[in-house]
Design a protein with these regions (language model features):
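Iron-associated oxidoreductase/ferritin-like identity signal
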Residues: 1-159
């Protein structure tokens, strides 16, 4: 059985993952509305991944005989001034999520809950990938900044 503290924190993380999914869906829809179908696809894939992360955590709580408590998902921003701004916000957000995951790992370590610590290793590694992916996209968009043909090509590659 999980400690009450870890159980509550994982339920909060489920909400954070679903909020992340909602954010990336909003980014996808905004990119699509501006004609960036490839960027929209990139964020759509992120939306699916974040839902998977929440599902993994829900399954984990169920496997440990703990109740999943779904809470309301807070409203997200729905418009951005540029594709670059979307990716910059993505990186900032993923850094926040990394902090949340690290907090879960710290609680599990404090509780000497080795099963939870082991499960969280996947999330820790995933966050390294998420931050790297966002940084890579910032670099790519900055590389073509001001070049409409370059942005068109980048968008096609992401489709």
């Amino acid at each position: 059985m999980l400690s009450e503290k870890l159980h509550a924190a994982i339920n909060e993380q489920i909400n954070a993952e679903l909020w992340s999914a909602y954010l990336y869906l909003a980014m996808s829809m905004d990119a699509e509305s501006k004609g960036f179908k490839g960027v929209a696809n990139w964020f759509y894939v992120q939306w699916l991944e974040e839902q998977d992360h929440a599902h993994i955590l829900m399954n984990y709580l169920n496997s440990r005989d703990c109740k999943v408590t779904l809470k309301p998902i807070a409203e997200v921003r729905t418009e951005w001034d540029s594709v670059l701004e979307m990716y910059q916000e993505t990186l900032r957000h993923e850094k926040v999520v990394t902090g949340l995951i690290n907090n879960l790992a710290a609680i599990a370590a404090e509780d000497r809950d080795f099963a939870s610590s082991n499960m969280l290793v996947w999330f820790i590694n995933e966050q390294v990938e998420e931050e790297e992916s966002a940084r890579d996209m910032i670099f790519a968009v900055e590389a073509v900044e001001g070049n409409k043909y370059g942005m068109y090509q980048l968008d096609k590659e992401l489709a």
